[in-house]
Structures are given as C-alpha cells and as structure tokens.
Design a protein with these regions (language model features):
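Residue(s) in the substrate-gating loop at a strand-loop-helix junction
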Residues: 130
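Active-site helix of classical SDR
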Residues: 110, 146, 154
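Short, small/polar-rich loop/turn modules that mediate ligand/substrate recognition or access, typified
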Residues: 162, 167, 233-235
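Substrate-binding pocket helix/loop in short-chain dehydrogenase/reductase
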Residues: 85-87, 94-96, 203
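Short C-terminal tail/terminal secondary-structure segment
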Residues: 81-84, 234-253
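Active-site loop immediately N-terminal to the catalytic Tyr-X3-Lys motif
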Residues: 87-88, 135-142, 163-164, 210, ...
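C-terminal helical subdomain
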Residues: 170, 178, 193-233, 240-242
Length: 253
C-alpha cells in the first residue's frame, strides 16, 4: 500500500459519494472520482462516464492506474433510486436500468479493482448497499432487489480475496437527507396520494433517532473501514441508519 491512500469513488460528484470524497481528502488521501455528471470536490481527479458500461470502466481503471500509480481503496458507491410503485405498474426498462447502475457497475469495478489491490499488497473495497437490501422496501422492488444483490456480491468477494489482504465490506445507509430522498418521497406521494410532509414524517418515525442520516455519517464510516484501524474487519454489512428497525411494522399502518 502506498504511503498516501489512493482512493477511487464511483458516484463521487454528489450525495454520499461526494461526502466520501471530501472525507478521504480531509484524511490525506489521493482521491479519484467517477460519475455520470458533475464537478469533483476540491482536491479530487474526475472522470465522467457511465460505470455500467464495461468499456468505459476499463478506460476508467486504466486512467486511475496512470494518474495515481495504483489503487488502495475502491468505494463502489454509485446508485440510483429506481422506479417507485407497486410491482404490477413497473416496467422492464426501469428494472433493467436499476440493476445496471446499482449491480452491474459494482461487478465491473470490482473485477478491475481486485488485480490492482493485489498488486498493491492489499487494500479495501467498500460497496454501498442500503437498509432496503436487508429489510426490503415496499413500492421499491427494483431498488431493494439490487441492493440485496450488492450485499451478495460483497459477501462472496470477501471470501475470495481475503487471503490477498483485501478486505470487502458493505455500507447500508438508511434514508439519507438530500435531493434523492426528496425525489423518492415525491414519487411515492404521487403514486399513493399521501402528502409529501406526511410521508417524510413517516420515514423519520421509522428511525429510532427520528432523523434522516447525513452523507457525512456514511463518509466517516467509509474512512474508518478503509483505515488500518479496521484491518480485521472483513465481510461485514454495516448499517448507518440511526436504528431503522421499524419499517416492517409501519407498512400500511
């Protein structure tokens, strides 16, 4: 591993990924951000691409190798919320897009990252799933299914690469305050007819701490998991959700 951590973050120009990038930079890392659009946080390199495209991902990792000289940490974070509604109203295109962005991209990035991490003598892979990938999530079946798949990929990869000093863990954020959660609530309000304010209140009541998670909370956990302090943490699914244990009990109540 290099003296200065070399970190690649997909979906790093906004939301959770941007918070991760800022946190790693503050921790002294060299950070490369990949996203479909946007501007990089200060101190980061940036590539604009679709990380569900295999050729584009190959080009990304070639550039990461040329720019940073290797890789120590992959944060496979990119994701979309997917369509909202009862399953009978969802179309195949929405399902396929959600799986491509949320699952295919993680696979493509991991298969390129592992050889680079082995060459570096070890490292860390962090995949971003969701509490929806543990509990399920009514009205969001494509998203929940994709996030279950991310956990399966992460757990399996941890078994495969631990012997090479590569640790693989999964972050499961709860409802994250920001534009994406706002859009999800608005879409659900349109489908269900429930006012936006009531839905937001219901989401908050599902959490023991009665507030949404912030990107910086997930970013802090990412920096820890990539650090030597977490050198024996591997194959774990870690929720950063404020205690979101009541979702199953509030559906349709």
């Amino acid at each position: 591993m290099a003296d200065q951590q070399r970190v690649l973050i997909t979906g790093g120009a906004s939301g959770i990924g941007r918070a991760m990038a800022e946190a790693f930079v503050a921790d002294g890392a060299r950070v490369y951000v990949a996203d479909v659009a946007g501007d990089p946080p200060d101190g980061c390199d940036l590539s604009i691409l679709d990380v569900s495209d295999a050729d584009a991902v190959d080009g990304l990792f070639d550039d990461v190798a040329a720019t940073m000289g290797g890789l120590d940490v992959l944060c496979a974070n990119v994701g979309i919320a997917g369509p909202v509604g009862p399953i009978e109203d969802l179309d195949v295109e929405g399902w396929d897009l959600t799986m491509a962005v949320n699952v295919r991209s993680a696979f493509l990035c991991c298969r390129r990252a592992v050889p680079m991490l082995r060459e570096a003598g070890g490292g860390s892979i962090l995949l971003t799933s969701s509490t929806a990938g543990v509990t399920g999530f009514p009205m969001r079946s494509p998203y929940a299914a994709s996030k279950y798949a991310v956990i399966g990929l992460s757990d399996t990869l941890a078994m495969e690469v631990g012997e090479f000093g590569i640790r693989v863990n999964t972050l499961c954020p709860g409802s994250v305050d920001g534009d994406r959660m706002r859009r999800v609530i608005e879409a659900e309000a349109e489908v269900t007819g429930v006012p936006v304010a009531d839905l937001r209140g219901a989401y908050e009541k599902q959490v023991s701490m009665r507030t949404f998670v912030e990107g910086r909370d997930i970013a802090a956990m990412a920096v820890f998991l990539a650090s030597p302090a977490a050198r024996y943490v591997n194959g774990q699914t870690i929720a950063v959700d404020g205690g979101l244990e009541t979702l199953r009990n509030t559906w349709r109540t």
